[in-house]
Every structure is written in C-alpha cells, then in structure tokens.
Amino acid sequence: MFFLHVRKYKHVIGGLLCLAGCFVISSCSSGRGNKSIDERIHILSMNRMIYDCVSRITGDRVKNIVLIDGSIDPHSYEMVKGDEDRMAISQLIFCNGLGLEHSASLRKHLEGNSKVIDLGARLLDKNCFVLLSEDGFPDPHIWTDMGVWISXVKEMASVLVQQIPQYAEEFQKNAEQILSEMEDLDRWAVRSLATIPEKNRYLVTGHNAFSYFTRRYLSSDEERESGNWKLRCMSPEGLSPEAQISIRDIMRVVEYICANDVGVVFLEDTLNQDALRKIVSCSKSGQKIRLAKSPLYSDNVCDNYFNTFQHNVRTITEELGGTVLE
C-alpha cells in the first residue's frame, strides 16, 4: 500500500526534490559570490579623514573599513566588540598617530603591529611639516592644514602602490587626481581666508584643534617666522576635549576676546557647547560677541573630508568678515 502511494505521488516528490536542488544551487552560487567579495584585500582606516582619502585612491579594488566614524571623539575612543576582528582581517591599518589614538585599548593593538601605517610619524621622518605641541604633547590635527594633508595622501598612495602592486597604475592615477583637487582646495582656502580683515583674524574654538589651520591660513609670513601666529587662536580646552574646563580657563579666553576685540566664537560639532556659551555670557560689558551660526568640524567630518574642509573655510571666512571666492 505504501509503495502504491509513493507511485501515486511520485511526480509531486520529484517536483519537491527539484525545488530543493534549486535552493542548494542558489545557496552555493550566493556563497561563491560573497566569498569573492570577502576575498578582497581589507584596508582599515582609523578615522574618516584617512578613510575618505584611501577610498578615493583604491576605489572598489579593496574593501575599505573605517573604525572611528560619526560624532565619536577619536581622542577618547575605546575599542568595542568587533574592532579586534576588523583589525585582524585587514592587511593594512592606516592611523593618524601623533597621539590621536591614545586610549589604552587602541595602543595595545596598534603599537608594534607590523600592519600599521603611522602617517604622522612617517611625515615627520620625511620633514613634511613642522610639528606643533602643547604642554609637551604633539598636536595630531594635521588634516586641518590641507598642505600637510596633501603629503599624507602622497604617503597613503605610496604605501598602497607598494603593498598592492597589481593595481599600482590605477591607484597612482587616482592619487594624482585627488592630489590635484586638494592643491586647488588649498589655494582656494588661502585666497578666501586672506580676504578677512587682519584685525578680525582671531579664531576662538571649543578645543585646540585649529592651530595648524591658523598657522597656514590666518597668519602672515612674519607671524609664522616669529611664532606669533599662535596669538591668532584660542580655546578653553587643550588638544584633547577630555579634561574638565575650569573657571580660570573660561576667564583666560574671555580676556583674550576682550584684548583682541573678537566678535564671534565657533562651536564645534561634537563638543559640549556649555563652555563657549559661558564665555559669551561672561564677556565684559560693551564687548559685542556671539556664537557662529554654524559649527566647525575638527575631529570628525560633515559628509566627507573634502566637503568638511570647504565647510570650515567658508564658515570661518564668512563669520570673520571675509569673502568666499569661487
């Protein structure tokens, strides 16, 4: 009786077996497709300022990953679940260096790691820029000076061409394109920020992230030579926005604002705004001062690194009374 039922429904059974076979084939094909994607070389960039440049150089030839993204403060970032795996699968790890990635968990995985490309250290070794420091600590914010970051992109391209030679010609061509755009942006920034009246070229921000920017774009040749360019910028917090701000810090900035007749202070996108609001409210009677209409981006990006640089230049130029040139 059982075999009679089997014969009766054998066409149904055959159909089910055929369908199952299709699923198996489909699954295998899908697996092969995913495997192909996963087999691409993985490149890990520690932040978006690096990632956006590496991605432009490599295109889709590699799998690009960014570790610290969004509004997260890179100064205080501690590794989370999955970060160790991202580092393990990556052939190259680009970091900014100069003390930016200074948390204990990051140092543990970066220091002594043969896959790590420390951009700051490499540029210093090649005398690509003059290092700034505060209280004995190096200033890591080199990406705010497009002229310095051009050297970093050259270093990224050099490493990528050497490590992934099968795409060397393509990477070099992409790098030349991006470097040309960056040189145009640098010249544009110099010309636009030069339209700011000299008496207005004072930059007050949330933390000390714009020293390289100030030295490059808001100072005269004489000020850069003498070191007096440092008088062009001020902030209540140091290089890393982690420490508590004291009343003394606030009053120091207030005195600076009054001494230089500063009319506007700039918030930063990821920082607590209370300190600068207190500074504005503490300003002496008769000192007209306000918060800028738009925040600056220091340790993160708005859309991408290149648009962020343009945003900062436009915002500072317009707020300080200059004219943004096209």
Curated annotation (Swiss-Prot):
GO molecular function list: metal ion binding
Signal peptide interval: 1-21
GO annotation (BP), single: metal ion transport
Binding residues annotated for Fe(2+), in chain numbering: H75, H141, H207, D299
Sorted UniProt keywords: Iron, Metal-binding, Periplasm, Signal, Transport
Superkingdom field: Bacteria
Gene Ontology cellular component terms for the protein in this record: periplasmic space
Main location: periplasm
Keyword Signal: yes
InterPro entries with a match to the protein in the record: AdhesinB, Bact_metal-bind_prot9, Lipoprotein_PsaA-like, ZnuA-like
Compartment list: Periplasm
Role according to the record: Part of the ATP-binding cassette (ABC) transport system YtgABCD involved in metal import. Binds Fe(2+), Mn(2+) and Ni(2+), with a preference for Fe(2+) and delivers them to the membrane permease for translocation into the cytoplasm.
Quaternary state and interactors: Monomer.
Entry's family note: Belongs to the bacterial solute-binding protein 9 family.
Protein name according to UniProt: Metal-binding protein YtgA
Organism listed in the record: Chlamydia muridarum (strain MoPn / Nigg)
Highest classification ranks of the organism: Bacteria, Pseudomonadati, Chlamydiota, Chlamydiia, Chlamydiales
Gene: ytgA
